[in-house]
């Protein structure tokens, strides 16, 4: 997603992932007490450069994040809740309650960021095989889509809204990339079948054991979609016109455990969840070649999954997926670090 404040976040329910895996100009929010439906942001420990946003609730295990302007949204894999916060403000609250509209789990999330279009929030539903579309301001349900596959055959992991308004959804289990045309979203379609945009069968993008297609973004010149394969660390380019699938040439580098991604101008940020870092990739405008130019990490990172760019900072979800079934540190958090 090539814009200043978006995410592609990417993603998976924690146990499945493990098997395969604020604006710099904004004031730092002050600490405040966490409540049942609202939590706060605080300045991180001296060993960290991050500002920390606390998520309300217990057992959240967050995954996806997206942002438009200074508003950000975070998903919960545990019950499908979606939280909303404002960069520079201490309060993060429940925007969409868990379980509503059959949303029992939520993974990747994206939001439109175009003054000429309505503000839509799109949520990939993991093993449910569903995608939900909401009004990003009111929280009203707009449309729903499904691939009709069983929970053992699909995992809708991440979603990216392209510049033309169409949405693209990755599936970590089934070798397909889905497209949701913008006109179907506007029409308020309910339980519509997901359209397979590209089947990866017979292409260089070979599915194997573990998690496959994960994070997705639109490239800088909007000619293609870029998808990371978690299990191999390979990056793939899907041409939006010809639908040709090719591997991005990273000069021999790989992005193992690649999860959520964010495109900010010509810099691609790739979260490598198990490795606790974000890789910076200088990607050419056409998305065919790139080079890993650096890494970002912070003491506050705790199995990071997805990232959203807001001005000169990155909002990073700390999923603690490695603590599922154990003792996670609560509250769950989002870190805001410099790019």
Segments predicted by a language model, with ranges:
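Short, low-complexity, disordered segments immediately C-terminal to signal peptides
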Residues: 12-16, 21-46
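Blade-level signature of beta-propeller repeat domains, shared across WD40, Kelch, NHL, RCC1
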Residues: 306-339
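Bacterial N-terminal signal peptides that target proteins for export
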Residues: 1-10
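Hydrophobic alpha-helical segments and helix pairs
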Residues: 133-196
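Short loop/turn segments that connect beta-strands within beta-propeller blades
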Residues: 86-90, 135-140, 181-185, 239-244, ...
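Beta-rich, blade/repeat-based domains predominating
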Residues: 56-71, 100-122, 148-167, 202-224, ...
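A short helix->beta-strand "capping" segment at the edge of beta-propeller domains
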Residues: 41-59, 290-294, 337-338
């Amino acid at each position: 997603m090539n814009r200043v404040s978006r995410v592609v976040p990417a993603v998976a329910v924690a146990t499945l992932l493990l098997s395969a895996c604020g604006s710099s100009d904004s004031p730092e929010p002050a600490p405040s007490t966490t409540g049942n439906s609202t939590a706060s942001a605080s300045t991180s420990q001296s060993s960290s450069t991050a500002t920390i946003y606390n998520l309300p609730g217990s057992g959240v295990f967050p995954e996806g994040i997206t942002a438009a302007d200074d508003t950000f949204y975070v998903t919960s894999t545990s019950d499908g809740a979606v939280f909303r916060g404002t960069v520079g403000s201490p309060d993060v609250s429940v925007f969409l309650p868990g379980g509503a509209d059959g949303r029992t789990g939520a993974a990747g999330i994206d939001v439109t960021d175009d003054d000429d279009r309505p503000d839509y929030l799109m949520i990939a539903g993991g093993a449910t095989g569903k995608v939900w579309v909401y009004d990003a301001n009111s929280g009203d349900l707009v449309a729903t889509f499904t691939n009709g596959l069983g929970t053992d055959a699909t995992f809708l992991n991440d979603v990216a809204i392209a510049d033309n308004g169409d949405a693209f959804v990755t599936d970590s289990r089934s070798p397909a990339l889905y497209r949701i045309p913008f006109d179907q979203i506007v029409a308020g379609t309910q339980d519509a079948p997901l359209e397979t945009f590209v089947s990866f069968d017979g292409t260089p993008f070979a599915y194997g054991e573990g998690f496959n297609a994960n994070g997705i973004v639109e490239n800088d010149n909007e000619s293609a979609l870029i998808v990371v394969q978690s299990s191999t660390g390979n990056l793939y380019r899907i041409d939006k016109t010809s639908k040709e699938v090719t591997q991005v040439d990273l000069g021999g580098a790989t992005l193992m455990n690649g999860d959520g991604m964010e495109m900010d101008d010509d810099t691609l940020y790739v979260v490598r969840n198990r490795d606790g870092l974000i890789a910076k990739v200088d990607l050419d405008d056409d998305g065919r070649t790139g080079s890993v130019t650096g890494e970002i990490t912070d003491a506050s990172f705790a199995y990071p999954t997805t990232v959203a760019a807001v001005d000169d900072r990155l909002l990073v979800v700390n999923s603690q997926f490695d603590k599922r079934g154990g003792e996670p540190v609560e509250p769950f958090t989002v870190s805001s670090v410099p790019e």
